């Protein structure tokens, strides 16, 4: 197992830098160039691959599950092909199927969603550091992270803390940080 360092100071500094950069970028945009962008966002999926009853919503109707999520994403992308789908992490830990497969079933299911980028959450480490790295290799979408390091602050675990997507003439930066 490798040592893991996540610096809160670095997260704070990065947030300030991002806000400054974003403000600087916006100051050069013409108001006549306004475009609409749809961002679909998931987080804390917690391996709920199958629908379940949520009694606070309905005593009888099942909700959620990856099949329902995939249907919603597909419908939105048919209506709006430039929509972006991102996930903020915590997709491994949850019902028995994730535990039995140590996250493998979750990554395989996520590959069908058409995710543009995802981050790592704390629950991706629930089955161990080495297992998490092994499962993440199977992801068919970019895993982004700019503040998880191998044995010190100089070597990031992932080579890509960010990506830049292009949609309808827009360049969109997506940065991954572990909270």
Describe each PLM feature range.
Residues 13-14, 33:
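Intrinsically disordered, low-complexity sequence elements enriched in Ser/Thr/Gly/Pro
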Residues 10, 23-24:
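Short, linear, compositionally biased motifs with a strong N-terminal bias
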Residues 1-13:
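N-terminal secretory signal peptides that target proteins for export/translocation
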């Amino acid at each position: 197992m490798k040592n893991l360092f996540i610096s809160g100071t670095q997260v704070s500094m990065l947030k300030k830098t991002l806000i400054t950069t974003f403000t600087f970028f916006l100051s050069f945009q013409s108001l006549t160039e306004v475009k609409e962008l749809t961002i679909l966002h998931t987080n804390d999926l917690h391996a709920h691959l199958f629908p379940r009853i949520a009694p606070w919503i309905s005593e009888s109707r099942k909700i959620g599950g990856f099949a329902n999520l995939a249907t919603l994403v597909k419908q939105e992308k048919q209506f709006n092909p430039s929509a972006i789908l991102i996930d903020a992490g915590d997709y491994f830990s949850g019902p028995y199927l994730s535990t039995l497969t140590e996250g493998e079933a979750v990554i395989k299911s996520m590959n069908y969603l058409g995710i543009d980028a995802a981050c790592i959450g704390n629950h991706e480490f629930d089955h161990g550091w080495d297992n998490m790295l092994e499962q993440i290799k199977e992801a068919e979408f970019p895993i982004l992270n700019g503040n998880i390091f191998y044995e010190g602050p100089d070597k990031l675990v992932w080579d890509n803390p960010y990506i830049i997507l292009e949609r309808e003439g827009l360049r969109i930066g997506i940065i991954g940080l572990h909270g």
